Amino acid sequence: YIILSGDQLYHMDLAEFLKKHQESGADITIACTAVNRADASGFGILKADKTNKITEFMEKPGSTKDISEWIIPDETRTPGAVKGKDYLASMGIYIFNANVMEECLNNTLTDFGKEIIPEGIKKYAVNAYVYDGYWEDIGTIRSFYDATLDLTGITPKFNFYDEDAPIYTHNRNLPSSKVNMATLDQVTTSEGCVITNATIKRSVIGIRSIIESGSYLEGVICMGADCYETDSEKADNATKKIPNIGIGERCVIRRSIIDKNARIGKDVSIGMGKIPEDGDYGWYHVVDGIYVITKNACVPDGTVI
């Protein structure tokens, strides 16, 4: 069994991972990567000998605990364990032999990091597979935001255009995006977008996004829309006095994640003033200074937050 995490971004050859597991004769193999002290506080950290056998495991030691004894020894350091990245952290990616997995789950234990792995080390042969490539945990709003916007860089850390590690997605059968009289700098766009006379910087524009004339976006992740609105639906919106799906005219939006199907009216300003405290404000949230516009949100004309 290969156990993967759903909130991480990384390039890994799983076939190579499986091959190393089989060659080692281990019952369980844990994918690991070198991290700094600050990151180590939130991950399971471990000790491994010269043969990559794991001898000890500690789940999320926190920021105040003395873990100096867990620093990676020089003789077992890999190229990814550069100065400052002194601790070996579990990536939350595992391979279990089938019989071992069944035995580990035939009890009341439920949490891999806190229960199953520490108990498994006591009973089974558990090895580390040290991964030196790109890996980012995107389980928080801040980490998701930073990792996503990093993709807009000229040479991003995670490269979608690597011929040796291609990324595939399903075919949506949509037209290519249309950009009319707009200025885009360090921007990635998905299929089916229509961008008109807007200025967009360092942003990711999702599928079927509609961005109207005069708008300015910077540091924005726009998730897009599930469908296009018809002319009759837009007429109905006008009758109900609600914006169409997308971003209206003359909006200024910074430091934001806009979830799918959001309706942002004309002359809306988000992220230009003083950042409010983190919290739930109805149709939007603030997390680590990042504005999160909720799915299907309706933002009236002239709104300023």
Task: Report each predicted region and the residues it spans.
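Active-site acidic Asp-centered loop
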Residues: L4-G6
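Short aromatic/hydrophobic "clamp" motif used to bind/position activated sugar donors
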Residues: Y1
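Left-handed beta-helix
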Residues: E75-G84, A98-I305
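Conserved core of the sugar-phosphate nucleotidyltransferase
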Residues: H11-Y94
